[in-house]
């Protein structure tokens, strides 16, 4: 968060190069990146569903996180990893792997995380902020989703929903909603967790 302010371009800024990270298709770009949609010169990604929409693509479908790929690129260039860079990469790797619990996590993932930790970052503070602390709105969202969840096939399929009306009622932000899609899969005995979100009236995202 202390470095977030430096990530926003000033009004009227025209970039010489545009790089997308962790984006498999142009329709997944956030709204503030849409002006650059047709001019992305490099896409760095780890999704096998990559649509190769950029001029060049750096793809490693075996990587658990794009942070791993960026780390490898930095090392290949012979550049140093500062504590600030290490912090950003650790956040990228830990969030993409669900704090190293998703099945895509590999031994290499842990080795890279260890090297980033050696750069002097406060891993405890990062993990607490990302994985052990939730806003009151986020907890209220989870409570309503659990209360309204639907079970199918003897509990093997769990369906949860995030209606637009709920987001408006609780004044939820994108930060409150982020990663809620994984909640359905936490129910014991579940083989398939499905989350339906209504981002706009008449539109449902699965």
Listing of model-derived features with the role each one plays in the protein:
Residues 37-40:
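A short helix->loop->beta-strand "cap" motif at the edges of active sites that frequently abuts
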Residues 28-31, 53, 205:
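Short glycine-/acidic-enriched loop or helix-start segments at secondary-structure transitions
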Residues 46-112:
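Short alpha-helices
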Residues 20, 43, 58-60, 195:
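Structural signal for conserved beta-strand scaffold positions within catalytic alpha/beta enzyme cores
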Residues 1, 14-17, 95-206:
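Hydrophobic helix-and-loop "lid/oligomerization" segment in the mid-to-C-terminal part
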Residues 23-26, 47-49, 164-165, 199:
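Short glycine-rich anion-binding loops that position phosphate/pyrophosphate groups of nucleotides
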Residues 6-10, 30-33, 57-60, 78-80, ...:
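A generic local secondary-structure boundary/capping motif
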Residues 1-35:
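N-terminal small/polar loop signature for handling phosphorylated ligands or for N-terminal nucleophile
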